[in-house]
Amino acid sequence: MLFCDDSKKYLKEQNINLKNEFDKDDKRVEKFSLKHQNIYFDYSKNLINNYILKSLLESAEKSSLKDKIKQMFNGAKINSTEHRAVLHTALRDLSSTPLIVDGQDIRQEVTKEKQRVKELVEKVVSGRWRGFSGKKITDIVNIGIGGSDLGPKMVVRALQPYHCTDLKVHFVSNVDADSLLQALHVVDPETTLFIIASKSFSTEETLLNSISAREWLLDHYYEDEKAVANHFVAISSKLDKVKEFGIDLEHCYKMWDWVGGRYSLWSSIGMSIAFAIGYDNFEKLLAGAYSVDKYFKETEFSKNIPVIMALLASYYSCTYNSQSQALLPYDERLCYFVDYLQQADMESNGKSVNIAGGTVNYQTGVVLWGGVGTNGQHAFHQLLHQGNIFIPVDFIAIATSHHNYDNHQQALLANCFAQSQALMFGQSYDMVYNELLKSGLNETQAKKLAAHKVIPGNRPSTTILLDELSPYSLGALIALYEHKIFVQGVLWDINSYDQWGVELGKKLGKNILKAMNDDSSDEYQNLDDSTRQLIAKVKNK
């Protein structure tokens, strides 16, 4: 049974008024909130009642979700278009039960690879790994893009208070040389270790940045190729290309086909995280995610946070035609969390074809966007409060901070809670009109201005409150959203683990690059007039 069938449309006819729902049920928050360890999930400000939630849960029970959860964790090839298992969960699994994929126990492989990463991190941190000139490494530059950049960068920033190794970690992703130059301007070639993170070792942006970084290094070492081995490690499955680059294969770390890029921070791709926060803290990150994996796998749907998250998001998409989801973390340390989750969500569920290959006739993935509070309040919250677009909101708040500025933390949390309350209750015309009269305006002035100050309210939001932002709790938070994305894909009958939509642009980009360098080429002759004219404008600059 598909989640987005016509039977969902009638749920909107319940005409939920949040203020009324809270007024008539003093146990609403208790009914519509959940807890996993130190994460509190309050979904009471959503447009639901007991009847709607029951209907959504029944749809989940009738779907293939239970079977799909088992299949994913057991290594079935649920990525059907690429014939691959989806096992990022195995990277953080603390159990010892064998998990066989294509005839191999991948638990042993994962354990072995973790140990290799741990040894590298400890070797660099301790100073036993030295640069070519004999100096200790002081800076790590991670060169990767997409999942090889967004996840590690987000975690390294989020866990800045846990940095404990004296290593400075930098990230380079964009093919725009400015991305690389920003890093090279602040590092010393004699004390820098580069991580090249590319499964294929042919990703255009990563390869071009890596080649330029290599040239920069060799320029300092008078073209002595032996220097490369002291200053580069790789995370790739293409050993021949890694060796050709000059990297010792002993320092090439694995990427498996059963780990998608946007779910890879738990793998060797998370090496840059371990360099910043130490390997012990990296393991705590994995442990937090594992706690959610167990909880997700073992908890009934009605008490399962990722399932409820997915049901609400799918309900709004199918019933209210929501095309957007706002994510508002009220913590500066989570400043890259929206960017990270954009890829995880939109690359996973931005699909218009079902698993069988048929075109879907319902809305699937939405635009996920947002920003850090309180900055967003002075930028885009106006649209959330008074715009005419339906946008569900997720607030993420941290109860305690790492600093001693308690007045700042209280103000931050007060603003977060106030925004969710304002979205829910709004302010009516009568409320505004009476306030304006009290402020000294006459009736004519008050009537003229009141309509502009009305805030409709009744706009749904969820608040996720963490006790603290630690490696463990961050791992758990990420895993909650990962599983939410998975559940939505199952409900919509789409494959959340391929990304064919990004391939065409890559292919055309290579053709256009050839055309830019040779206007007699077939690639140039096959261009449309608009693209040809754009190339001409660039050449005539």
Curated annotation (Swiss-Prot):
GO biological process, one term: gluconeogenesis
GO CC annotations, alphabetized: cytosol
Catalytic reactions of this protein: alpha-D-glucose 6-phosphate = beta-D-fructose 6-phosphate
Cysteine-cysteine disulfides: none
Record keyword Iron-sulfur present: no
InterPro entries: G6P_Isomerase, G6P_Isomerase_C, Phosphoglucose_isomerase_CS, SIS_dom_sf, SIS_PGI_1, SIS_PGI_2
Active-site residues, record numbering mapped to chain: E347 (proton donor), H378, K506
Protein's recorded name: Glucose-6-phosphate isomerase
The species this protein was found in: Francisella tularensis subsp. holarctica (strain OSU18)
Gene: pgi
